[in-house]
Amino acid sequence: MNKPIGYWIKRLDAALEGHLDATLARLRLSRRQWQTLNVLAESPLSPGQLEGILNPLWGSDKRLRENELAALVGHGLIIMIDDRITLSESGHAKYLEAQRIVEESRKDLSMGIGIDEYAMALSVLERMTLNAERLAR
């Protein structure tokens, strides 16, 4: 019997999170810390802007967010300049190192999946998500 898509989505999500956590642990980064470095690599942001971007990924647990940001500050990876949070020099180096191992991991995860198959899967998931969100209103 085929499992419903929700089963596979939840199973994939849990497996991806576990794999990413293990991958990033080699650099002593949490997934949320990496997400923060990844966002800040694009440009410095105000605390409110950063919160707005990270909320969909992290949820609304303010204490968790504060702890993760405090750890990044404590390790000298992010700094505040002109009321904006930005990567420090060592933060940028850590981001590049993490980006490299995450890319290697992504290649391993998508082994045997063609570019067109991957694009189609993303397209289908996006449309299903939008449909479900519309119907939930």
Give the residues covered by each predicted segment.
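C-terminal regulatory/oligomerization modules of transcriptional regulators
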Residues: 45-47, 119-137
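Structural signal for well-ordered, non-membrane alpha-helices
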Residues: 17, 21, 103-106, 110, ...
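Charged, amphipathic alpha-helical coiled-coil/dimerization segments
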Residues: 70-123
